[in-house]
Amino acid sequence: VENIFVEGLKENNINKLLSAPKSDLHNHSTKGCRREWLAQKLNVDISKPPQHLDGLEGMQNWFRSNIKLVCDGYENMLLRWEGAFAEAKRNNITRLVMNFGTAEVDQVGSVEAFRKLIEEFHKTYCPDSIFEAELTYPSFGNVEEEAAELDKYAEEGYFKAIDICAGENVQPFEAFLPLYKKAEKYHLNKKMHVGETGSAEDVRRAVETLGLSEVHHGINASTSKETMRFLADNHIQVNVCPSSNVMLGFAKDYKSHPIKTLVENGVRVTINTDDLLIFDSSIENEYLKLYKSGTLSAEQLDEIRQRGLGNL
């Protein structure tokens, strides 16, 4: 029997797609809500993003001049966090991983205060969903300092993973070793943004150097058979964000998106939103775009969905 998700893709039925359980495992918390939801809450118009944002800098500029303009400050950050959980409810996201920077946690106060606040949203909107908080650090940070302070954030046991974002090849992978070694003490999943702009070789070296279990983006691994075999053999999960890649110009289009090559070479991939508020494509739409473009079959997309849920 065909499941509701496969039916939804083949019939172009949004309600069926919304009702099927899904995951979102690469989600920047302060940009995790829908534009429509936020506009309604603030009672303002927020314009649609252009089809192409010029790289990471273009993305930040658009965010500053369109979102921050109407939604800045502490209370509005909380509102955007709330919106991410509201979206999990609307889209039946039964496994949600969101990342938070230490500066964002610090704004709330203690880690315990942060946990209470986030769990209140979790309980209100999607109590049955598995939620995991991920701690993300900027690639330009002072790693020694961050490693020394990691205990403060990790000892509560609330954060399940560690990540580096905000631009690749800013420091050599070895520079992050103190932080990733410290993360092992708390059994944190080790992840990193790599292979979005960086090379296939970068992806492999990051995994080997830091002992990553997952890679955020990782699409440029598709240019190397060796790297893809390495990722497949070592069961490294690659959390792909199609609309993000296309809009930022890191993938040409949906039809030729590198996810196709990764899947065909046995790499374990998941499909995610990255920054929903910016890229304006909610999780069911990410699957639908890839299906409509002929990138992957409904069955392949369903397998990816199941993997994200932890069923495979």
Identify the meaning behind each predicted range.
Residues 1-188, 197-205, 209-214, 220-237, ...:
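Metal-cofactor-binding active-site regions of metalloenzymes
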Residues 190-192:
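Conserved hydrophobic beta-strand within the GNAT/NAT acetyltransferase core sheet
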